[in-house]
Swiss-Prot record:
Recorded GO MF terms: beta-N-acetylhexosaminidase activity
Top EC class for this record: hydrolase
Gene name for this UniProt entry: nagZ
Positions marked as site (Important for catalytic activity): 174
Key words, A-Z: Cell cycle, Cell division, Cell shape, Cell wall biogenesis/degradation, Cytoplasm, Glycosidase, Hydrolase, Peptidoglycan synthesis
Catalytic activity: Hydrolysis of terminal non-reducing N-acetyl-D-hexosamine residues in N-acetyl-beta-D-hexosaminides
Pathway noted in the entry: Cell wall biogenesis; peptidoglycan recycling
Function summary: Plays a role in peptidoglycan recycling by cleaving the terminal beta-1,4-linked N-acetylglucosamine (GlcNAc) from peptide-linked peptidoglycan fragments, giving rise to free GlcNAc, anhydro-N-acetylmuramic acid and anhydro-N-acetylmuramic acid-linked peptides.
Stated name of the protein: Beta-hexosaminidase
NCBIfam families hit by this protein: PRK05337.1
EC nos: 3.2.1.52
Amino acid sequence: MGPVMLDVVGHELDAEEREILDHPLVGGVILFSRNFDDPAQLRELVRQIRQAARHPLLVTVDQEGGRVQRFHQGFTRLPAAQSYAALNTPQEAQRLALEGGWLMACEMIAMDIDLSFAPVLDLGHGSAAIGERAFHREAESAIPLAQAFIDGMHQAGMKATGKHFPGHGKVSADSHKETPIDARPLVQIVEHDMVIFRTLNACGKLDAVMPAHVIYSQADSRPASGSPYWLQQVLRQTLGFEGVVFSDDLSMNGAAVMGSYAQRAQASLDAGCDMVLVCNNRQGAISVLDHLSAAGSPRIARLRHRGQVDREGLMGSARWKQAHQDLQRLHQRWEEAKQA
């Protein structure tokens, strides 16, 4: 599979998109809310994407739950990660997290979507970019919830992507708008933020990792997403991670310090990413395809979904009905708690 993941504009493909998707460097597509009208339309769009590519690619989405859920009508309203621990006993929180990962993955696989970029492994709720997307502020409480969520995804046949390595939760700035700088001592990041990544990787739960567009100034002057130190020395060598490394979206302002779109993509791949995301800027994506010097990684193909999910059969199953009811209720309780 090629090393570039990009987006499409609407509910169906246009002629230029069909041509772009057939480019040998394109290995994936990420979908957004603007691509969704209803489940039938979404399933047809995914079919068009796979047909246009004429080579294997990943179809992906951010369907985390809470404020980051791209598809709503016809899908379960998933609770925010923070709500699992905030409103339940530890045992019930883990049960619900497992069902949340399973149900989310099943609903996406029924659309022939390979991957939802989840779960968020950042610690703490103070970051503008993270907030309720994090399970907990402490690793010892977040780890069992993240592990349960991943176990649910794996039961459904979907691989898990931990984000945003080595941890985005302690910077208040939003990397969508600027490049955050985390000036904490390196030992603090290693012994706090990275614990969840290290633990989940050691027990074989992480299939992919997405680094942060954050500069950890005590370690490197480059964002982690373009840093050989973080991706090769720490992630690959020290942690022994063998899965796929995705860049976060290179159109985010947090990546702008790496140069033009083509320079950002090349820097990320040279640093150790297997695949780069270039979203919401057609000319930027074309520039990357025109100038990139890179081959696809064989690791990427491992992330294709392995599930066989019929949507009607899924929604008729006892497990889906119970999980749907429990998760919708948790979502509603969380929204009410935030208003209190």
